[in-house]
Amino acid sequence: WSSDVCSSDLTGLDREIGDADHGLNMHRGFSKVVEKLPSIADKDIGFILKNTGMVLLSSVGGASGPLFGTFFIRAAQVTQAHQSLTLEELYQMIRDGAEGVISRGKAEPGDKTMCDVWLPVVESLRQSCEQKLSVQAALEAASQQAEVAAQSTITMQARKGRASYLGERSIGHQDPGATSVMFMMQMLAQASRE
């Protein structure tokens, strides 16, 4: 989200069915996370994730701050005292974070929300665990699933969030929150390659 491309893409999507601030909010929040990282980089994964969540809660406006903040705070609980993660631990981390988002947002599949990406990503990671894939292969598969899932929101009518006020006019537009999750999964997959 620190890239201008992500920020611009998300703002453009949000302009169509929201209030045109999602990309700016995500950019601001993750820029604050990047500023904080040097002071916590030597800590365990759980500590870093919890601090990321707290920064997002305090710096990202709209519903996205609480939702992404919740994701990272819940994900932190599974990763306390970890310096690295197995695929099973990564799956548990993302599953728990996604469950926190879904619980907080009270979203269901088909509501045209980030839930429509989180659930397929979690399922993809579960299947990767069963297949005993490497972390990199699992993240590649989850990233591909996230892209398909985000694109699937185009045909949905929004039932949650600001876009729900548009009713049928929300059909034909990709959900910005779902797209944020897709970007996050793409960035995780890219990081696993480096």
Please give the residue ranges for each predicted region.
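C-terminal binding/interaction regions
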Residues: 110-116, 129-188
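A short glycine/serine-rich beta->alpha loop
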Residues: 13-18, 39-43, 53-63, 103-108, ...
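Hydrophobic/aromatic-rich structural module bridging two neighboring secondary-structure elements via a short loop
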Residues: 43-82
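Short, small-residue-biased leader/transition segments that mark boundaries at the very start
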Residues: 1-7
